[in-house]
Amino acid sequence: MLLIPAIDLKDGHCVRLIQGDMDQSTTFGEDPAIIARRWLDAGARRLHLVDLNGAFAGQPKNLVAIKAILKEVDGRIPVQLGGGIRDLDTIEKYIDAGISYVIIGTAAVKNPGFLQDACSAFGGHVIVGLDAKDGKVAIDGWSKLTGQDVHSVAKRFEDWGVESIIYTDIGRDGMLTGINIDATVNLAQSLKIPVIASGGLAGMADIEALCKVEDEGIEGVICGRAIYSGDLDFAAAQARADELRA
């Protein structure tokens, strides 16, 4: 089970949002590279970066911070990045810079042709982030519910060659109320590609519960507010996940 620390970038700093609201942000670190080093030293095997300004602007906005993180990581573990990725040129620049996986969210739903082109050009490097509430896909920084069923959308993306799906229950994200494990497992069972859980991770109990259903197709979990607030010790959680897998 991959435990993936999240580094959300806003104005060059590491922050956490509550339910995707840019006005409800808590700054957890001035220097994102130092934050990246912390998780690397704690045993992280992948990092999850989000360009929050980019997500709202529709184009990259935190390039300096992203490059500083990549320099710190220096290729030792994969780094996945989402937020503001709307064209093939941006994907190419990020991959050339050292990003292992690009995460396409809103653009995948609003512009399916772009996602197909991305999978064709950068196969193996494309992850789709599907945000949902009550089983319906949300877009545009969670501000709009589309009415589209998350299972049917994910299945279509799987057929196009997406590497994996990050599934976020937006009713729980940043709330420390616990991962929606039933919904995550239901999605994973309907797909052949792996699912990464996200949204609401509260503590060790969630890690243990996810490990029990790992074989259903759940590759990992995004660790956000809980590892910054102290509700979850990242190194201890990764050790526990490894122990349960042994």
Curated annotation (Swiss-Prot):
Family label: Belongs to the HisA/HisF family.
Any Pfam family the entry gives: His_biosynth
Species annotation: Delftia acidovorans (strain DSM 14801 / SPH-1)
Gene3D superfamilies: Aldolase class I
A single GO BP: L-histidine biosynthetic process
UniProt pathway: Amino-acid biosynthesis; L-histidine biosynthesis; L-histidine from 5-phospho-alpha-D-ribose 1-diphosphate: step 4/9
Catalytic site: D8, D131
PANTHER family xrefs: 1-(5-PHOSPHORIBOSYL)-5-[(5-PHOSPHORIBOSYLAMINO)METHYLIDENEAMINO] IMIDAZOLE-4-CARBOXAMIDE ISOMERASE
Enzyme Commission number: 5.3.1.16
Main location, first listed in the record: cytoplasm
Record-given protein name: 1-(5-phosphoribosyl)-5-[(5-phosphoribosylamino)methylideneamino] imidazole-4-carboxamide isomerase
Keyword Transcription regulation: no
Keywords noted in UniProt: Amino-acid biosynthesis, Cytoplasm, Histidine biosynthesis, Isomerase
Cell compartments where the protein resides: Cytoplasm
One GO location term (cellular component): cytoplasm
Primary enzyme class: isomerase
Catalysed reactions, semicolon-separated: 1-(5-phospho-beta-D-ribosyl)-5-[(5-phospho-beta-D-ribosylamino)methylideneamino]imidazole-4-carboxamide = 5-[(5-phospho-1-deoxy-D-ribulos-1-ylimino)methylamino]-1-(5-phospho-beta-D-ribosyl)imidazole-4-carboxamide
Gene Ontology MF terms in the entry: 1-(5-phosphoribosyl)-5-[(5-phosphoribosylamino)methylideneamino]imidazole-4-carboxamide isomerase activity
InterPro entries: Aldolase_TIM, His_biosynth, HisA_bact_arch, Isoase_HisA-like, Isoase_HisA-like_bact, RibuloseP-bd_barrel
